[in-house]
Amino acid sequence: HPELAESLMIAKQFLYLKHLTFEGARRRYGELNEQILKRLDYELSTIEWMGFPGYFLIVWDFIRAARELGVSVGPGRGSAAGSVVAYSLGITNIDPIKYDLLFERFLNPDRISLPDVDVDFDEDGRADVLHYVVEKYGSKRVAQIITFGTMAPKAAIKDVARVQKLPLSESNRISKLVPEKPGTTFEKAFKEAPELLAERESENPLIRATMKYAEQLEGSVRQTGVHACGVIIGQDDLEKFAPIAIAKDAELNVVHSV
């Protein structure tokens, strides 16, 4: 039965995680006092209940491999620094007991959310870590994440103007009317720049057409790219769950939305 098989898998993962955690905790703290034991028991039971033993094992494994490969690894950022389990595993290098950091900011049984460990590798060593992950899990189960660049008003005007063969001077003049603010849409731009709105009713038919088609193209995908950091590891071939592409400059396959 699939659900039983998954439960057994999580149980095995948890036993190994628990073993590694206590092994690491003894290296970090020496003798484990009542405070540390209580904290470890609470964190491990939360991780088991939320079904994340496998996640911790994967992160532990590639960080361990990175250090063995001589790759510089950051001390850990964000809420993961509040986990004694993560500290014991060597995922982070900040002692949550010493600095009184809260585990609940990382994982909270009352607020179901995915764990997020921010891991930093040196720029030169990142490729070595990726290579290790691909070798371990297989190239069909590891992929980077595609990104989509969409048409903003300024770019839409310039692209349409070029196709419409509108003179470059006019194209530049109109596009400069768009406010230089992040997240600007045509709707917002028309409110802030009435002179841009007036171009819709221009006496020049090429300008009217340019404005019309630029508005229609706003938000359309203009180009694709690869996420700077994100990597997906699947328990099965990723093509079973999402479309896969081969990016020109990517080190791996890239996956569309999952």
Question: Could you tell me what each predicted segment is?
Answer:
Residues 1-258:
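Alpha-helical scaffold/interaction cores of sigma-54-like transcription cofactors
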